[in-house]
Amino acid sequence: MTISYEAVRDFLYREARYLDDKQWESWLEMYAPDATFWMPAWDDRDQLTEDPQSQISLIWYGNRSGLEDRVFRIKTERSSATIPDTRTSHNISNLELLEQSDGVCKLRYNWHTMNYRYKTVDHFFGTNFCTLDTCGETPLITAKKVVLKNDYIRQVIDVYHV
């Protein structure tokens, strides 16, 4: 089964809205139970790390339960990174469907997120690479690789920033 460009675009816009509106449960439902979420780090040679199991990553969750735990901490104020509460605006551009076959869609897109906290606006930007399972009624994210392109991060970065 293939999915249209417009359907993928709307799916990604919905994910961005869920993050901006703090609709955590709806956001989690967009991920398959075995979905990976990975933000590799830049190494000393200015190259992205390639293996989340053996090299440093900015974020690594091997399945959705890691994301669920993160959301639990955010919602129950057990996350100093989210106190005081932040406000975000996610913006998506340059969406490309790279490959489609047998209910799988691979895509990439650029993003820019503005984050307001402590009377300051921070800008985060990068490129995401996603794999979607398109076999069901609605797509599910089975893998997301977030390439953060900022050289300097003034404070912590979290799943809702990207």
UniProtKB/Swiss-Prot annotation:
One of its GO terms (molecular function) is dioxygenase activity. Pathway: Xenobiotic degradation; toluene degradation. SUPFAM superfamilies: NTF2-like. The keyword NAD applies. GO terms for biological process: 3-phenylpropionate catabolic process; toluene catabolic process. CDD domains: ring_hydroxylating_dioxygenases_beta. Disulfide bonds: none annotated. Keywords: Aromatic hydrocarbons catabolism, Dioxygenase, NAD, Oxidoreductase, Plasmid. InterPro entries: Benzo_1-2-diOase_ssu, NTF2-like_dom_sf, Rng_hydr_dOase-bsu. Its EC number is 1.14.12.-. The keyword Manganese does not apply. Belongs to the bacterial ring-hydroxylating dioxygenase beta subunit family. This dioxygenase system consists of three proteins: the two subunits of the hydroxylase component (XylX and XylY), and an electron transfer component (XylZ). This is Toluate 1,2-dioxygenase subunit beta.
